[in-house]
Amino acid sequence: MDEGKMRKLLVIEAVLDPVADKLLRQPSQPVKTIDGVVREVAEFLEYQMTLQHGGRGASGFAAVQFGEPIRLIIFQWDTLTNRVLINPEVVSEKDSVTKIEECFSIPDHVFIVARPKMVKCRGLNLNGETVTVKGRDKMARLLKHEIDHLDGILIDQIAERRLY
Protein backbone atom coordinates (compact mmCIF):
# COMPACT_ATOMS: atom_id res chain seq x y z
CA MET A 1 0.00 0.00 0.00
CA ASP A 2 1.37 3.43 -0.95
CA GLU A 3 1.13 5.31 2.35
CA GLY A 4 1.97 8.61 0.61
CA LYS A 5 -1.13 8.40 -1.57
CA MET A 6 -3.41 6.83 1.01
CA ARG A 7 -6.15 9.14 2.15
CA LYS A 8 -6.28 9.84 5.85
CA LEU A 9 -9.38 7.97 6.83
CA LEU A 10 -10.37 7.09 10.37
CA VAL A 11 -13.00 4.83 11.83
CA ILE A 12 -16.02 6.94 12.65
CA GLU A 13 -17.68 6.15 15.94
CA ALA A 14 -21.17 7.61 15.72
CA VAL A 15 -21.96 7.64 19.41
CA LEU A 16 -18.88 9.71 20.20
CA ASP A 17 -18.91 12.29 17.42
CA PRO A 18 -22.01 14.26 16.36
CA VAL A 19 -20.46 15.18 12.97
CA ALA A 20 -19.67 11.52 12.26
CA ASP A 21 -23.13 10.51 13.44
CA LYS A 22 -24.72 12.88 10.92
CA LEU A 23 -22.55 11.53 8.07
CA LEU A 24 -23.32 7.91 8.96
CA ARG A 25 -27.06 8.59 9.03
CA GLN A 26 -27.21 10.02 5.50
CA PRO A 27 -27.35 7.97 2.29
CA SER A 28 -23.99 7.59 0.55
CA GLN A 29 -23.52 8.82 -3.00
CA PRO A 30 -23.40 6.41 -5.95
CA VAL A 31 -19.99 5.87 -7.54
CA LYS A 32 -20.11 7.31 -11.06
CA THR A 33 -16.59 6.38 -12.17
CA ILE A 34 -14.24 3.76 -10.80
CA ASP A 35 -11.19 6.00 -10.64
CA GLY A 36 -8.05 6.27 -8.54
CA VAL A 37 -9.91 7.66 -5.54
CA VAL A 38 -12.37 4.75 -5.51
CA ARG A 39 -9.53 2.26 -5.86
CA GLU A 40 -7.66 4.01 -3.04
CA VAL A 41 -10.68 3.78 -0.74
CA ALA A 42 -11.08 0.08 -1.61
CA GLU A 43 -7.38 -0.50 -0.90
CA PHE A 44 -7.69 1.29 2.44
CA LEU A 45 -10.71 -0.81 3.42
CA GLU A 46 -8.83 -3.96 2.41
CA TYR A 47 -5.99 -2.86 4.69
CA GLN A 48 -8.45 -2.23 7.54
CA MET A 49 -9.91 -5.71 7.08
CA THR A 50 -6.39 -7.12 7.45
CA LEU A 51 -5.79 -5.09 10.62
CA GLN A 52 -9.12 -5.98 12.19
CA HIS A 53 -9.14 -9.68 11.32
CA GLY A 54 -7.46 -10.64 14.58
CA GLY A 55 -8.98 -7.84 16.67
CA ARG A 56 -12.68 -7.19 16.98
CA GLY A 57 -13.29 -9.52 14.07
CA ALA A 58 -14.58 -7.23 11.34
CA SER A 59 -16.24 -9.15 8.53
CA GLY A 60 -17.08 -6.08 6.49
CA PHE A 61 -16.92 -2.32 6.19
CA ALA A 62 -18.70 0.42 4.29
CA ALA A 63 -16.66 3.34 2.95
CA VAL A 64 -18.81 5.80 4.91
CA GLN A 65 -17.54 4.27 8.16
CA PHE A 66 -14.17 5.79 7.27
CA GLY A 67 -15.48 9.19 6.24
CA GLU A 68 -16.00 8.46 2.52
CA PRO A 69 -19.76 8.65 1.80
CA ILE A 70 -19.65 6.63 -1.41
CA ARG A 71 -21.56 3.42 -2.15
CA LEU A 72 -18.74 0.93 -1.66
CA ILE A 73 -18.49 -2.02 0.71
CA ILE A 74 -15.89 -4.67 1.40
CA PHE A 75 -16.66 -7.99 3.04
CA GLN A 76 -14.95 -11.22 3.89
CA TRP A 77 -16.13 -13.74 1.30
CA ASP A 78 -14.27 -16.70 2.75
CA THR A 79 -11.33 -17.15 5.08
CA LEU A 80 -8.83 -15.99 2.46
CA THR A 81 -10.73 -13.56 0.24
CA ASN A 82 -12.27 -10.12 0.62
CA ARG A 83 -14.68 -8.80 -2.01
CA VAL A 84 -15.52 -5.25 -2.97
CA LEU A 85 -18.99 -4.26 -4.17
CA ILE A 86 -19.58 -0.83 -5.68
CA ASN A 87 -23.11 0.58 -5.80
CA PRO A 88 -24.53 -2.60 -4.26
CA GLU A 89 -28.25 -3.13 -4.10
CA VAL A 90 -30.35 -5.89 -2.62
CA VAL A 91 -32.39 -7.43 -5.44
CA SER A 92 -34.15 -10.04 -3.32
CA GLU A 93 -34.36 -11.25 0.24
CA LYS A 94 -36.07 -14.17 1.89
CA ASP A 95 -37.25 -15.14 5.37
CA SER A 96 -36.04 -13.47 8.54
CA VAL A 97 -34.01 -14.39 11.58
CA THR A 98 -33.37 -12.38 14.74
CA LYS A 99 -29.86 -12.47 16.24
CA ILE A 100 -27.29 -10.52 18.20
CA GLU A 101 -25.38 -7.95 16.14
CA GLU A 102 -22.63 -5.40 16.71
CA CYS A 103 -21.23 -2.52 14.67
CA PHE A 104 -17.83 -0.82 14.58
CA SER A 105 -19.58 2.55 14.34
CA ILE A 106 -21.42 2.03 17.62
CA PRO A 107 -18.71 0.45 19.78
CA ASP A 108 -19.33 -1.40 23.02
CA HIS A 109 -23.03 -1.95 22.30
CA VAL A 110 -24.84 -5.13 21.32
CA PHE A 111 -28.24 -5.18 19.65
CA ILE A 112 -30.92 -7.72 18.74
CA VAL A 113 -31.66 -7.26 15.02
CA ALA A 114 -33.93 -9.08 12.56
CA ARG A 115 -32.31 -9.62 9.16
CA PRO A 116 -33.17 -11.67 6.09
CA LYS A 117 -31.97 -15.27 6.12
CA MET A 118 -31.08 -15.06 2.43
CA VAL A 119 -30.21 -12.10 0.19
CA LYS A 120 -29.20 -11.61 -3.40
CA CYS A 121 -27.20 -8.46 -4.16
CA ARG A 122 -25.95 -6.90 -7.35
CA GLY A 123 -23.18 -4.36 -7.81
CA LEU A 124 -19.93 -3.68 -9.62
CA ASN A 125 -16.47 -5.04 -8.94
CA LEU A 126 -13.35 -2.86 -9.22
CA ASN A 127 -13.16 -3.69 -12.95
CA GLY A 128 -16.62 -2.17 -13.48
CA GLU A 129 -18.21 -5.55 -14.18
CA THR A 130 -21.66 -6.35 -12.82
CA VAL A 131 -21.51 -9.10 -10.23
CA THR A 132 -24.20 -10.90 -8.26
CA VAL A 133 -23.60 -12.12 -4.72
CA LYS A 134 -25.91 -14.51 -2.91
CA GLY A 135 -25.65 -14.84 0.83
CA ARG A 136 -27.41 -16.89 3.43
CA ASP A 137 -27.31 -16.82 7.21
CA LYS A 138 -24.20 -14.93 8.39
CA MET A 139 -23.34 -13.69 4.88
CA ALA A 140 -26.90 -12.40 4.33
CA ARG A 141 -26.73 -10.55 7.66
CA LEU A 142 -23.35 -9.06 6.78
CA LEU A 143 -24.42 -7.87 3.33
CA LYS A 144 -27.60 -6.24 4.66
CA HIS A 145 -25.68 -4.60 7.53
CA GLU A 146 -23.12 -3.03 5.17
CA ILE A 147 -25.70 -1.95 2.59
CA ASP A 148 -27.75 -0.41 5.41
CA HIS A 149 -24.70 1.75 6.17
CA LEU A 150 -24.78 3.01 2.59
CA ASP A 151 -28.45 3.89 3.03
CA GLY A 152 -27.72 5.86 6.22
CA ILE A 153 -29.22 3.21 8.49
CA LEU A 154 -27.44 2.14 11.67
CA ILE A 155 -28.39 -0.86 13.78
CA ASP A 156 -29.62 1.31 16.64
CA GLN A 157 -32.43 2.47 14.31
CA ILE A 158 -33.66 -1.01 13.37
CA ALA A 159 -32.83 -3.06 16.45
CA GLU A 160 -35.59 -4.78 18.35
CA ARG A 161 -33.64 -3.83 21.45
CA ARG A 162 -30.19 -2.98 22.75
CA LEU A 163 -28.69 -5.55 25.12
CA TYR A 164 -25.97 -3.21 26.41
Model-derived regions: residue spans:
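Positively charged
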Residues: 1-164
